[in-house]
Every structure is written in structure tokens, then in C-alpha cells.
């Protein structure tokens, strides 16, 4: 039996695509191994969103090429989609370059590379609609659920529309069917992802259908939590807020990437609104859902960002009191408008502002978390003595450590939060 390993780089959306790959491999009787050193073929599912992601992908490919077992390498994902023709010449170490649209042909491609053939299979942007099998790690209590592909927003710094194509919603019934299948396999939490989850439905139904989708998913037997990531600020509709406020299975949590608070910087980014508009949106959410947890991400060092703009961002964070914040240093991406804008910020200034922002936010996050000490919360176990509360999205926020709790992954337990382990993580006691 042919042994195949899959390495996933990048975002949760890539994780979903890797799980489809694993499902296809298993269905076609190929042996899936977790250790690439034991594999005859290694598939690297890459990201190319920013320079650092491309560098990580190339380093991974070259490291695997030097491995003692000399596996055949298949480069998949965004890097292959965007740069296949260049990489074909520059990376002879790779046996194949495939785009997401070639996922269904993986068994055939593997057979071809094992016969010594090099393969280039990068069709135009396509979407997996849900017919493919999906293999999820045993014992994992959550799954990312991709509801759309592509993006119609035109942020000046972003390559996603050119890589992934225009926004395409998956049919609602197919999303629900996949969710039912996941629940039947023991998944307790669905984490909705897309380039823009809040645009769901507009392209194929002529109206936003995310509220309806959330209701349907939250009422699936076996699903405890439905969590929403990658929301767009101007699409937080009253209907969406109502569903989040009234549907018990939809967790009071929203990932709302705002990117900046300075009006001038936002305008150069091609993003809507102002810092004041962002604050109003946050206040509306908190009025309707008093205990909502809000996460956001920001870019520092965007072209033209002056110290005054950066201070506006810090002041916004002080006023917004966001629970969780991630930040990126601007990376000029080939083919984007932002890469050629005047006023490029020196790398050392980007780094200094990044450090200041994260330090500034740490005290806010600590204060938010301290406000939960002494309270009892539901925790979804992810392993021995560790899990997450509703306030914590997988892999990006903190966790709750529950000493002496023997319940397995997937269990829902009541925990009293007793102290902070660090800024982001809690210690808790099981409540029997």
C-alpha cells in the first residue's frame, strides 16, 4: 500500500482542503501516515498570502527534498495556484504542482509521480462543494466548515481574489449535509470559515443567507456550538445579530477583522468605514449580546501610516476593549496596489509598532479575562485536562486547563475559572 503524508501550512481554510485530500486518499485505499519520514509521497498544502507564508512553504519543500527517505513531493494549495509556472522551473525537487481544483484527481496524480512523471495540474479557481470525502483527526471535537470560496472585496494589499477567484457560496443544503455528517462522527463544534462569511448567499440566492444557515447548523443533533470567523464589518446585519443573540447553539463570539482605525489608512487599504464606525458596530453587538466575545486583527506599517495614524489605532484598542487581537506587519505582495503605494514604512518601524500594539493589547486582554475569574463556564474538552470555553476559538485564542478532569475529548464539562495561567489561558476546577 502506498504511504502518503499531508502537511498543512496556513489558515483554517487550508486545513479543510487538507482533510478533503486525506479523505480521498483513504477512500482510494492509500495509507495515510502522519510522519513524512515514513511516506513515499508527501503533499504540502501551501499558503502564499504573505511573504512569510511563501518562505515557510519553500523552506518546507526544500527540507523534505533533503530527507533520507526521498519522498516524491506534491506541492498543492495557494502557492501552486499562484506560482506554478515559475516553480515548475525553479523547484525541480517537486514532482507535481496542483491547484485546489485538482484535489479530486489526487490518486491519479500520485500514480503518475510514482512512475517518474512530473505533473502540472492547476485549473482555474474551483470550489469543493461537499461531495468529496473528508478525514478528520481522531478525537478532534471541532471541525472547520468552509461555507464559501473566493472573495469579491478588493482590499489593496490582498492577493486572495487573484488566487481564489470571485466569491462563490456553497449551496446551503450541501453545507448542512456536511455538518450532519460531521456531527455523526462525533464533532461537537462547527467553526464557519470563508474569506468573508458574512457575504454568504448573496451571489447564488440574491440575499444574505448566513442567519438561516446558522439556525440550521445550530439545530443539528449532536452539535453543541457553532462559531463564526472572518466576518466583514459592514455586513453585520440586524438579522445576524438577532440569530447570535437568540439561538442557543450559536456561540456569542465574533471574529471581526477590522485591519485599522485610521480613516486615511483604511481608505488606502480599500476597506470601508472608520474607527468610529467600528466602535459603533462593536457597541451594537454588545448591546444585543452583552457577553459577546469579539476578536479582531490589524495590520501595522501599511504604506503611508504615520505615527499619528498608529496612535489612532492604539486609542481605538483602548476604547474598543476587544477580548482577543491578532496583528500582522504589512507585507508588500506582488501584483497588489499596496505594493506600489508611496510611503512604504521601513521594516524596523513596522516591527516597533507591532511590538507596541501587542504590548498595549495584552493589558486589555488580561483585564477582559480577569473579569471572568470565579465564574462557571461550559468547556469543550480537547484532550486530557485541557479544553476551551465559548470565548476561545480553536488554535488562535487561549485554553482552559482543568486539573484532574479525566473526561475525554469531546466532553462538555462545567468548570469554575479560578485563575489565569498566563495572559491568555485559564486554570479551572471541574464542577461535578
UniProtKB/Swiss-Prot annotation:
**Reaction(s) this enzyme catalyzes, per UniProt:** L-aspartate(89)-[ribosomal protein uS12]-hydrogen + (sulfur carrier)-SH + AH2 + 2 S-adenosyl-L-methionine = 3-methylsulfanyl-L-aspartate(89)-[ribosomal protein uS12]-hydrogen + (sulfur carrier)-H + 5'-deoxyadenosine + L-methionine + A + S-adenosyl-L-homocysteine + 2 H(+)
What range(s) does the Radical SAM core domain occupy? 137-367
Q: Which SUPFAM superfamilies match?
A: Radical SAM enzymes (SSF102114)
The cofactors it requires, by name, are: [4Fe-4S] cluster
Q: Where is the MTTase N-terminal domain?
A: 2-115
Stored SMART domains: Elp3
HAMAP family the record matches: MTTase_RimO
Protein name as it appears in the record: Ribosomal protein uS12 methylthiotransferase RimO
> What is the species of this protein?
Moorella thermoacetica (strain ATCC 39073 / JCM 9320)
Amino acid at each position: 500500500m502506498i504511504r502518503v503524508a499531508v502537511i498543512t501550512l496556513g489558515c483554517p481554510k487550508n486545513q479543510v482542503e487538507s482533510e478533503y485530500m486525506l479523505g480521498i486518499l483513504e477512500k482510494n485505499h492509500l495509507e495515510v501516515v502522519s510522519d513524512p519520514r515514513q511516506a513515499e509521497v508527501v503533499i504540502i498544502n501551501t499558503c502564499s498570502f504573505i511573504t512569510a507564508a511563501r518562505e515557510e512553504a519553500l523552506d518546507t519543500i526544500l527540507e523534505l527534498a533533503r530527507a533520507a527517505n526521498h519522498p516524491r513531493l506534491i506541492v498543492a494549495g495557494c502557492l501552486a495556484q499562484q506560482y506554478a509556472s515559475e516553480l515548475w522551473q525553479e523547484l525541480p525537487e517537486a514532482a507535481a504542482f496542483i491547484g485546489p481544483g485538482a484535489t479530486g484527481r489526487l490518486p491519479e496524480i500520485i500514480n503518475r509521480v510514482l512512475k517518474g512523471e512530473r505533473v502540472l495540474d492547476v485549473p482555474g479557481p474551483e470550489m469543493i462543494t461537499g461531495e468529496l470525502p473528508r478525514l478528520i483527526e481522531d478525537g478532534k471535537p471541532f471541525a472547520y466548515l468552509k461555507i464559501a470560496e473566493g472573495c469579491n472585496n478588493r482590499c489593496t494589499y490582498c492577493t486572495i481574489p487573484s488566487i481564489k477567484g470571485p466569491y462563490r457560496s456553497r449551496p446551503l443544503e450541501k453545507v448542512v449535509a456536511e455538518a450532519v455528517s460531521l456531527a455523526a462522527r462525533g464533532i461537537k463544534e462547527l467553526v464557519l470559515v470563508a474569506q468573508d462569511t458574512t457575504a454568504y448567499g448573496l451571489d447564488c440566492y440574491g440575499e444574505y443567507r448566513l442567519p438561516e444557515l446558522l439556525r440550521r447548523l445550530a439545530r443539528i443533533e449532536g452539535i453543541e456550538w457553532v462559531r463564526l470567523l472572518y466576518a466583514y464589518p459592514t455586513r453585520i446585519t440586524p438579522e445576524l445579530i438577532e440569530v447570535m443573540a437568540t439561538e442557543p447553539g450559536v456561540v456569542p463570539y465574533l471574529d471581526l477583522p477590522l485591519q485599522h482605525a485610521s480613516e486615511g489608512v483604511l481608505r488606502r487599504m480599500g476597506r470601508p468605514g472608520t474607527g468610529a464606525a467600528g466602535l459603533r458596530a462593536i457597541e451594537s453587538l454588545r448591546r444585543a449580546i452583552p457577553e459577546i466575545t469579539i476578536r479582531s486583527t490589524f495590520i501595522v506599517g501599511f504604506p503611508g501610516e504615520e505615527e499619528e495614524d498608529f496612535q489612532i489605532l492604539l486609542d481605538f484598542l483602548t476604547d474598543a476593549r476587544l477580548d482577543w487581537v491578532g496583528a500582522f506587519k504589512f507585507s508588500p505582495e506582488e501584483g497588489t496596489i499596496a505594493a506600489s503605494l508611496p510611503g512604504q514604512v521601513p521594516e524596523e518601524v513596522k516591527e516597533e509598532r507591532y511590538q507596541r500594539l501587542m504590548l498595549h493589547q495584552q493589558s486589555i486582554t488580561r483585564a477582559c479575562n480577569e473579569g471572568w475569574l470565579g465564574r462557571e463556564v461550559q468547556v469543550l474538552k480537547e484532550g486530557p485536562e485541557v479544553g476551551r470555553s465559548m470565548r476561545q476559538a480553536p488554535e488562535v485564542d487561549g485554553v482552559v486547563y482543568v486539573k484532574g478532569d479525566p473526561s475525554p475529548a469531546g466532553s462538555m464539562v462545567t468548570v469554575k475559572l479560578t485563575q489565569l495561567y498566563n495572559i491568555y489561558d485559564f486554570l479551572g476546577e471541574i464542577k461535578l
